[in-house]
Amino acid sequence: MKIGIINTKIRTVFSAFACMIAASLVCTMPARAVVEININKGVIEPLPIAITDFLSADQLGPNITSVIAADLERSGLFAPIDKGAFIEKISNPDAAPRFEDWKVINAQALVTGRITKQPDGRLKAEFRLWDTFGGQQMIGQQFFTTPDNWRRVAHIIADAIYERLTGEKGYFDTRVVFVDESGPAQKRVKRLAIMDQDGANVRYISDGRAISLTPRFSPNRQEVTYMSFEGGSPKVYLLQLETGQRELVGNFPGMTIAPRFSPDGQKVVMSLLQDDGSANIYTMDLRNRSTTRLTNSQAIDTSASYSPDGSQIVFSSDRGGRPQLYVMGADGSNPRRISAGDGSYSTPVWSPRGDLIAFTKQSQGQFSIGVMKTDGSGERLLTSGFHNEGPTWAPNGRVLMFFRKAAGAGGPKLFTIDLTGRNERQIQTPNFASDPAWSPLLE
């Protein structure tokens, strides 16, 4: 079946040429810049950064600048300086700025750039990142794209700045698939939607005629697996984002719950409801549609998530009386409980870095989003409230997105929070939204 609502093709339309540094700007200072952010410190003071409006013949330059600034500010690691404080007006982004003018306003880093339209209709976006106190250029790049992809250029530039100043990959050039919820609570329409990580460019990828739940990206970013109640019973589908084509992953006799891809994209792990009311974890090989049962209990085993190397699986099970977190080998061997605190644990998901597991915890009437080490130690709750659920990791493993429903609220909303628990932000969506899943970095 083809869903003809919208084309969600993910295109690689950029070419980058790094380090386009003019000979006159090459300096003899050490390659390691003075300005940097130690992202591994417990408490981080945001870095003051000046982001000048990119020069352009129209509003496109300032628009791109605004997206870059918003990305960096939302990370909690950067504090963009108000443009009203700028002393120097940049007229030539290729020339070295007057560093003293930027040091006066405590801009520890400076971004300049330019947008020009090419004869073939494409846009050329150039930017430079400067260390103002070190008096040197840190990075210079240019990108070519089509005019309708200007926001993506902004995200890519923000990622480049983030990586140069923190030493780690950014997460701004990514997408999020989620469940869009509209209509009254008694007749809620739940359809799949996809958007940029900042909430822009929302597009619907299912028509809402049947409830759709638990969307998850494939590692190649081109496919989404999800559960649909089309026909009255829950089934798992695989949707091709580029073409809108979808296929039934498996038509199992019982309910199919929480499908998720393996890191290599060749398998889907999911829970199947048994006749006795229990649920066990299975994998399906997408190449030949063969299934393998991994757990065999009288409990509810669900919400399986692979480790980044594919060697282990974390899941939730009430085999001990209430839902707790367990880790087992990818073949189902050696299951062991890792959660030890009071309350119930659910929706575990392994960090892309491999060092942490995020989860939902219910305790004393509160739903919390937390993280723990993969052996269960070091549990930390990042945010708590009436109802918080469904964490998903940014591809760099530094930020989580989840959904929250406040007491008395009409429906859930999406939020992000970093690992310090101090930087929580709402992501604006057209309607209520739940069950987000973050994509890997786009290419």
UniProtKB/Swiss-Prot annotation:
InterPro entries associated with the record: 6-blade_b-propeller_TolB-like, PD40, Tol-Pal_TolB, TolB_N
A GO BP annotation: cell division
Any Pfam family hit: PD40
Subcellular location: Periplasm
Principal place of residence: periplasm
Residues in the signal sequence: 1-33
Gene3D superfamilies reported in the protein's UniProt record: TolB, C-terminal domain, TolB, N-terminal domain
Segments forming a coiled coil: none
CC per GO annotation: periplasmic space
Keyword annotations from UniProtKB, A to Z: Cell cycle, Cell division, Periplasm, Signal
Domain of life where this protein originates: Bacteria
Quaternary structure, from the entry: The Tol-Pal system is composed of five core proteins: the inner membrane proteins TolA, TolQ and TolR, the periplasmic protein TolB and the outer membrane protein Pal. They form a network linking the inner and outer membranes and the peptidoglycan layer.
Stated family: Belongs to the TolB family.
HAMAP family from the UniProt entry: TolB
PANTHER family: PROTEIN TOLB, PROTEIN TOLB HOMOLOG
Function: Part of the Tol-Pal system, which plays a role in outer membrane invagination during cell division and is important for maintaining outer membrane integrity.
Protein name (record): Tol-Pal system protein TolB
Source organism of the structure: Brucella anthropi (strain ATCC 49188 / DSM 6882 / CCUG 24695 / JCM 21032 / LMG 3331 / NBRC 15819 / NCTC 12168 / Alc 37) (Ochrobactrum anthropi)
Taxonomy of the source species: Bacteria, Pseudomonadati, Pseudomonadota, Alphaproteobacteria, Hyphomicrobiales
Gene: tolB
